[in-house]
Swiss-Prot record:
This is Uncharacterized transporter slr0753. It comes from the Bacteria. It comes from Synechocystis sp. (strain ATCC 27184 / PCC 6803 / Kazusa). The lineage of its organism: Bacteria, Bacillati, Cyanobacteriota, Cyanophyceae, Synechococcales. One of its GO terms (molecular function) is arsenite transmembrane transporter activity. It is a multi-pass membrane protein. Belongs to the CitM (TC 2.A.11) transporter family. PANTHER family: P PROTEIN.
Amino acid sequence: MVANLPALFSLGVFVGVILLIMSEKIHLTIAAFLGALILVFTHVITLKEGIDYISQSYATLALFFGVMVLVRSFEPTKIFEYLATQMVLLAKGSGKLLMLGVIAITTPICAVLPNATTVMLLAPLIPPLAQEIGVDFVPILILMVFVANSAGLLTLVGDPATFIVGDAINISFNDYLFKLSFMGVLAIVSIVVITPFLFRHIWRSRFTHLEDLPHPQINHPKVLMAGGVIITLVLIFFVIGESLPVPIPPASVALMGACLALLLASQSKIDTVHNILRDVDWSTLIFFMSIFVIIGSLEKTGVTASLAQLLAVVVGQNIAFGAIVLVFTVGLLSSVVPNIPLVVAMVPLLKQYVVNIGFAGPEILGANFDGQLPAEVLPLFYAMMFGATLGGNGTLVGASSNIVAAGISEQHGRPISFHRFLRYGLPVMAVQLVVAALFVAWLMFTQQG
């Protein structure tokens, strides 16, 4: 087990960063950045090693950056404000239809864009619209977050956790779509079923004075049409890119889409390159890079290998039992630990466990491993992915999209307390983890059949 000072120090820094993030005393990016730099300054990990660990996750960072630029480039067209207003008008004064509208609009967007990015775009539109029709916008924001986190399971690129795990086990966009996206459907259905009970006040409401709503107009329609072509091509290549004679991974597709969107926005003069790049969420990117360094230190000092040995002792070679245990264990952990660092830590841990129990050779531990893991152990990674994604619905600090929504709510004068979010999040998380465990069990049953 862990017995050396650097390992204990790395573990202490990791736990300290997580506690700082949970306390919300300082910004999560500062907490992670500080933790990474402490490890570099104390020479637990060198700066070069830290950069190497960041570069191992280049695909995740490139995908995030590309999507952020792509989406920000088309903000001046006001397409998202227009969609939000149409959502309220289509509800025709019905709280029930409004809640279903939030689910219907958020779901497809989050299937193809990272959930935190989608929340950044749609959440700022909810408070003014809700205030116009006289309802509390906090429950609507919380519902949007639940949907965003859950819909991330619909595709490989919909959630950072799914992309990180998918990248680690080398699953293609199409394979994910056919094998695992049904779990995203089940997660959304579970929200639809539970919404009338959790949000009963708004569900039963009737709104009046809809004629007083703001009516935003779409700007630059020709640019928006061209942008629609770019986004359509990006989505098509997300699906077919990796199956082409010369494979094109999702990260490369996102970067090309971002470049074309920048070119279109700049040449049409709807915005400047400087403004678009300035508004990229650099804070989130730096947070991820810092977390990759911290997780790298856990790998280097042997903490990850020690935890893998412990997992092998507890679970043994019973993959089915281990998968079900992982759904709930990772789900509960993800409710208090942001799911990105959790997944980044769990991937090498699970790979080491697979090696320890003899299901694969040590070559799978290499950063450049591009083969396939044995089919028997894949349910472990699926279970970890589902637990990390759906567990993020449990508390305010469980996912980055939760924190984004809370910040937007506070800007509009209604802070979301930890306990208020918990009141909604706990039942949603409990239902979804049970559904995920049943789905993983079904996957293993059909695999054996």
